[in-house]
C-alpha cells in the first residue's frame, strides 16, 4: 500500500510540473534569443513523437492482449480507434470554423477606413506647394483625434460585443475537442491507477509505477497543448487540468480500498485513448512552421521523441515479462 501511494505521489508531482511549467518556460524563451534546438516547437515535436510511440508500443499491444484474454475480435478494437480519430477530426474542424467565424470584421473595416483617411490627409499634405507650421499642427491634431476615436470605438465594441463562449462556461465546454480529450485521458489514467493499486507484488508495482512515470509526461504535454494553452476560460482550464492530474492517484486509492480494475472497461477506453494519441501525435505538429534553417531540427526532434519513448517502453515491457527490476 505504501509503495503504490509513494509512486502515485511521484506521478502527481510529475503531472503538476509538466502541465504548468511549459507556460513559464515558453515565456522565458520568448524573452531571449531563439535557439534553433532549445525552443518550444522542438519540445512539442519531441512530445508528438513520444505520443506516437506510446500509442503503438504501449496502448495498442496492451489492448490486443486484453482482447485476446476476453476472446474479443480485433476488428472491434480497430473500429474504436478509427471512430475516436474521426471524432477528434470533426470536433477540431468545428473548433477551427468557430474560431474563424468569430473574427471581428467590423474592427478590421474600421482600421481600413482609418488608414484610408490618414492616407488622404497625407496626400493633401504632399500636394500642398508650401509648408505651413500651423497646417502641420492641425494635421497632427486630426491624426491624434482619429486615433482616439478608433481606440474608443474598439473599446466600446469589446465591451458591448462579448463572446458568448467566454461568458457561458457550458458552451465553452463543448466549443472545442478539449473536453473529449481530457475525458479520455482522465478515464485512461484512472484505469491505470486502478491497475497499479490492485497489484500486490512489490516488483510488479515498481515496474508498472516507473513505466507510468516514464510516459506520463507525454500525456501531460497533451493537456498543456490542448487545455492550458488553448482554453480561454481560466476556471475551466484549471478544472480540466486538475481532473487529469488527480485521475491516477484517485484510481490508486480507490483500488487499494475497494474497487479493482475492470478489463472490459480498460479495453474500451484504452482503445479510444490510443486513437486520440495517434491523432494528437500529428495534430500537435500542424502549427509548426518548417523553414530551411529548422527543418533538420524538426525532423531530429520528432524522431528523438519516437526513439526515446520506444526505448523506454521496450525496456519496461521486458522488465514486466521477466518480472525483474
Swiss-Prot record:
Transmembrane segments: 5-25, 46-66, 74-94, 179-199, 239-259, 264-284, 296-316
Induction trigger: Expression is modulated by the levels of iron ions in the environment.
Pfam families recorded: Zip
GO cellular component term of the entry, any: membrane
Membrane topology of the entry: Multi-pass membrane protein
Example GO BP: zinc ion transmembrane transport
GO molecular function: zinc ion transmembrane transporter activity
Inactivation phenotype: Targeted gene disruption results in increased growth rates of blood stage parasites.
Glycosylation sites: 106, 160
Protein name (record): Putative metal ion transporter ZIPCO
Species this protein is from: Plasmodium falciparum (isolate 3D7)
Organism lineage: Eukaryota, Sar, Alveolata, Apicomplexa, Aconoidasida
Amino acid at each position: 500500500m505504501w509503495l503504490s501511494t509513494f509512486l502515485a505521489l511521484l506521478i502527481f508531482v510529475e503531472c503538476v510540473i509538466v502541465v504548468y511549467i511549459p507556460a513559464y518556460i515558453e515565456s522565458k524563451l520568448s524573452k531571449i534569443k531563439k535557439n534553433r534546438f532549445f525552443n518550444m516547437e522542438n519540445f512539442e515535436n519531441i512530445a508528438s513523437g513520444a505520443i506516437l510511440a506510446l500509442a503503438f508500443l504501449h496502448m495498442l499491444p496492451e489492448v490486443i492482449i486484453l482482447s485476446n484474454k476476453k476472446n474479443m475480435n480485433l476488428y472491434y478494437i480497430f473500429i474504436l480507434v478509427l471512430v475516436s480519430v474521426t471524432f477528434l477530426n470533426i470536433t477540431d474542424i468545428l473548433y477551427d470554423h468557430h474560431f474563424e467565424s468569430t473574427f471581428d470584421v467590423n474592427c478590421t473595416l474600421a482600421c481600413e477606413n482609418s488608414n484610408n483617411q490618414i492616407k488622404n490627409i497625407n496626400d493633401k499634405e504632399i500636394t500642398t506647394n508650401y509648408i505651413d507650421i500651423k497646417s502641420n499642427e492641425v494635421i497632427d491634431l486630426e491624426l491624434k483625434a482619429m486615433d482616439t476615436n478608433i481606440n474608443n470605438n474598439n473599446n466600446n465594441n469589446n465591451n458591448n460585443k462579448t463572446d458568448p463562449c467566454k461568458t457561458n462556461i457550458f458552451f465553452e465546454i463543448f466549443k472545442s475537442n478539449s473536453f473529449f480529450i481530457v475525458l479520455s485521458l482522465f478515464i485512461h489514467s484512472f484505469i491505470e491507477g486502478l491497475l497499479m493499486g490492485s497489484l500486490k507484488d512489490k516488483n510488479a508495482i515498481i515496474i508498472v509505477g516507473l513505466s507510468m512515470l516514464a510516459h506520463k509526461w507525454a500525456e501531460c504535454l497533451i493537456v498543456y497543448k490542448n487545455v492550458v494553452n488553448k482554453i480561454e476560460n481560466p476556471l475551466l482550464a484549471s478544472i480540466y487540468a486538475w481532473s487529469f492530474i488527480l485521475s491516477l492517484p484517485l484510481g490508486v486509492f480507490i483500488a487499494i480500498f475497494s474497487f479493482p480494475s475492470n478489463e472490459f472497461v480498460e479495453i474500451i477506453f484504452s482503445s479510444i485513448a490510443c486513437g486520440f494519441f495517434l491523432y494528437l501525435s500529428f495534430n500537435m505538429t500542424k502549427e509548426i512552421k518548417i523553414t530551411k534553417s529548422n527543418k533538420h531540427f524538426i525532423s531530429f526532434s520528432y524522431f528523438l521523441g519516437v526513439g526515446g519513448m520506444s526505448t523506454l517502453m521496450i525496456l519496461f515491457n521486458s522488465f514486466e515479462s521477466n518480472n525483474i527490476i
